[in-house]
Amino acid sequence: MAAVTVEITRSEVLRPSPASAGGGEMVPLTVFDRAATDGYIPTMFAWDAAAAAALSNDAIKDGLAAVLSRFPHLAGRFAVDERGRKCFRLNNAGARVLEASAAGDLADALAHDVAAHVNQLYPQADKDRVDEPLLQVQLTRYTCGGLVIGAVSHHQVADGQSMSVFFTEWAAAVRTAGAALPTPFLDRSAVAAPRIPPAPAFDHRNVEFRGEGSRSHSYGALPLERMRNLAVHFPPEFVAGLKARVGGARCSTFQCLLAHAWKKITAARDLSPKEYTQVRVAVNCRGRAGPAVPTDYFGNMVLWAFPRMQVRDLLSASYAAVVGVIRDAVARVDERYIQSFVDFGEVAAGDELAPTAAEPGTAFCPDLEVDSWIGFRFHDLDFGGGPPCAFLPPDVPIDGLLIFVPSCAAKGGVEMFMALDDQHVEALRQICYSMD
């Protein structure tokens, strides 16, 4: 297949309509926001030619303008208040929208090598540029049929749970032509209220942030030419088989797949049996905090669990045992831990805190990091032409970073996108579907 050329045909800043209330209000980042990646996260969805023909760019943009009025942080900008704190300025400045044309057919691109031009399918935001929009969208139409909606949002605005709600609400706004839709819970101060006096009980400076003792300092680098992006499809029958392996213990799809991936990637890496390996697991804290935070809270509410095992134990253990290690680690992110983290945020309010997000080229080996969008309801992402035919993963060159998303092709199936050292790829391919 010939190289696909993507040409930007239009660029504009789209303001909320109607403008949201706020009048330039300054909202400080919570400690959860400060722990999130200080950068833009791309998300891309594709619709085939028939679905794309039913969607006009104007309708998509009108829906975006309508939904932005209910998500004012995405339409705002970063600023600094009189106390020197990084804040959101809720000023209705708007989102950047690009329209683009790609030569060729989307179906051909998906069947062959869309990865070769995937980084041209979303806006290239610059987090260091003054007044940079916090949400940027690109509508790319293929000349022979097909549409890709690529969006980047700054991670300190919202986590994956929040952005999944935003995307489905945007689709609903287009599909219903502006019918009244609910506003999410937006009160950041209510979800990060410290005790008086604050009493942090854990080493948050070195766990959630890049303190001098942080494990993030120990990871090496890998030449980018050795990074390989992989996509592994787990059909629903395979997922059911994994759950059966766990037996009577209650096991989520995510826990089963993570146990499997952890085992197989560790085996493919051919690590020393005496070495230890851990996984950094994102944990949604909305239902774990005390009191619980509304599920529709728009912002960041994620901390991390760190299941850890010796390689020999991981490879020899049953699936049920590995799931148990994962479940126990996640359970430690409880109400007490979350309140301690909030209290730490108050104690360190004036400190410079660097999140632990990895840079491109980082090699997590012998460890992994995982994020899950399995709960994302792709079937609800219907702008009027039906749900997307594909989720397109960005090129994220970090060895050992995994992302689970629900399959667009098979209900109950899951796609695993990951980057891995090229030297370990063939070994993983040979064993990735083995449950031995």
Curated annotation (Swiss-Prot):
Q: Check the record and name the PANTHER family matching this protein.
A: TRICHOTHECENE 3-O-ACETYLTRANSFERASE, TRYPTAMINE HYDROXYCINNAMOYLTRANSFERASE 1
UniProt keyword annotation of Cytoplasm present:
no
Q: Where is the active site?
A: 155, 382
Instruction: Identify this protein by name.
Output: Tryptamine hydroxycinnamoyltransferase 1
GO MF annotation list: acyltransferase activity, transferring groups other than amino-acyl groups; hydroxycinnamoyltransferase activity
Q: Which InterPro entries match?
A: CAT-like_dom_sf, Plant_Fungal_Acyltransferase
Going by the entry's taxonomy, the superkingdom of the source organism is recorded as Eukaryota
According to its UniProt entry, the function of this protein is described as: Hydroxycinnamoyl transferase that catalyzes the transfer of an acyl from p-coumaryol-CoA to tryptamine, to produce coumaroyl tryptamine. Serotonin, tyramine, and to a lesser extent agmatine, serve as acyl acceptors in vitro. Can use caffeoyl-CoA, and to a lesser extent benzoyl-CoA, as acyl donors.
Q: What is the lineage of its organism?
A: Eukaryota, Viridiplantae, Streptophyta, Embryophyta, Tracheophyta
Its source organism is Oryza sativa subsp. japonica (Rice)
Q: Mind listing the UniProt keywords for this protein, alphabetically?
A: Acyltransferase, Transferase
Q: What is its EC number?
A: 2.3.1.-
Family note: Belongs to the plant acyltransferase family.
